[in-house]
């Protein structure tokens, strides 16, 4: 005999528990409440979320969106430690931009990149992170030592380090929208504002640690932070900006780059993110050992190492001014509409909203890109009479329409709105991409090569001894500098230049005259290949 549905649902059933006590199961009438069936509990999402912060602070910053333009990646400089990510194609040095075929638009679809001291990361169109370079402290977010292939054979560590590969683990099913690198650590922001990091921090005594209980980690680990919208890194510290305008810092604080005092014997406390007494911040930046924050009224705050006045703060007491222990207003930047700030080891660059660039700090290797005849009288000389540092933020003459500026240890790159990239500073390892000349580049100079001739550069990164740029290949319109295009015959005049294991041949460089104030002269060079650019090259 079969019973109907209503009969079955109302029939009381009994079951025997483990202790032998009989108990009846609840039928539908037992769980009815106010004549209604219970509401099913919603499934709890397993995806990570930012930490909730008490209070109702208003959001003033947006979580970064994933860029959509797919870019080719070009590398130059020293590659002796796998920094260039060329895989099996080992290269000790590349003098001018060369295509990295592993990261081409049809294979990866890179939309953004980040460069650390000796490693790099690229962000793909689908929000995945690819890393390559030195992995001694797990900055790549994956294991490369003593690894075996599917046949059980050991895989060469250099090959694994030098081949751009995905970061898996906790990021496998997440969508990353921003990635950034320090010297020994990598950090990422997801599309819901979570912050993940991996690697470690170092200090003057060696490895400081990843956390107070862990020396280093190769596994992407979520930080206990509120909703994050921007990250900035120095050599071994991180600054995180929340969507509500708060600033958190952590890492090595020996030079007060964390903006808080710590006893030397308790420096592990610096490995835990802590907020600073700043509010309404809309942008953060960092040099190797100094830090910056910009608030919604355009005021700029700085802290950290200031020995060459890289914080932009002049202090009468020389010893007292060597470090700025807490966030301090940079009066010298009042009146400038600063968009972003970044720094190298001991120098700083600030990008203004109008596309110009300010520079200050150390200048012994032409890090500032300012011609001698345009330097203010406040420039400090060394005992030999050479430029040492400049404490006054000063406009770099002739460099305009800049959309991004990045600093390596002693060199810089600037990307302009017309898709070009300029470099200056130390060329000891050919990190400026100006050919096989290792003399310092005194002023911003156009970077040229056949590989990027028809590429509109969109983003750049500068490391310790190398650089990486990315752009749209086969751009429909050739980028124009100051409204003047290269003459067609320039394409036929190429200067053969040897590189280590590369056959790139650059377009002959143009070298326009420079006036006494550093601006380009209106007189054109005698060379037919010359193009009027915002600055000249250096000998």
Curated annotation (Swiss-Prot):
Cited Gene3D superfamilies: Regulator of chromosome condensation 1/beta-lactamase-inhibitor protein II
Chain residue ranges for the region called Disordered: 1-53, 478-539
Compositional bias per record (Polar residues), positions renumbered to this chain: 514-525
Q: Where are the RCC1 repeats?
A: 70-125, 127-191, 192-243, 244-296, 298-353, 354-417, 419-472
Say if the entry is tagged with keyword Protein biosynthesis: no
* Gene Ontology MF terms in the entry: guanyl-nucleotide exchange factor activity
Q: Name one GO cellular component term.
A: chromatin
Skewed-composition ranges (Basic residues): 34-43
What keywords are annotated for this sequence in UniProt?
Cell cycle, Cell division, Guanine-nucleotide releasing factor, Mitosis, Nucleus, Repeat
Q: Name one GO biological process term.
A: cell division
Q: Indicate where this protein is primarily found.
A: nucleus
| InterPro entries given in the database record | Ran_GTPase-activating (IPR051553), RCC1/BLIP-II (IPR009091), Reg_chr_condens (IPR000408)
The record's annotation in Pfam families points to:
WD40_RLD (PF25390)
Q: Where in the cell is it found?
A: Nucleus
Segments of skewed composition (Basic and acidic residues): 11-33, 486-504
| SUPFAM superfamilies on file | RCC1/BLIP-II
Please give the superkingdom of this protein's source: Eukaryota
Matching entries from PROSITE patterns are given as: RCC1_1, RCC1_2, RCC1_3
Q: What does this protein do?
A: Promotes the exchange of Ran(spi1)-bound GDP by GTP. Involved in the control of mitosis. Regulates a variety of nuclear events, including mitotic check-point, chromosome decondensation and mRNA processing/transport.
Task: Quote the subunit structure annotation.
Answer: Oligomer of dis3, pim1 and spi1. Interacts with ned1.
Which PANTHER family does the record cross-reference, listed alphabetically? REGULATOR OF CHROMOSOME CONDENSATION
Under which name does UniProt file this protein?
Protein pim1
Source organism lineage? Eukaryota, Fungi, Dikarya, Ascomycota, Taphrinomycotina
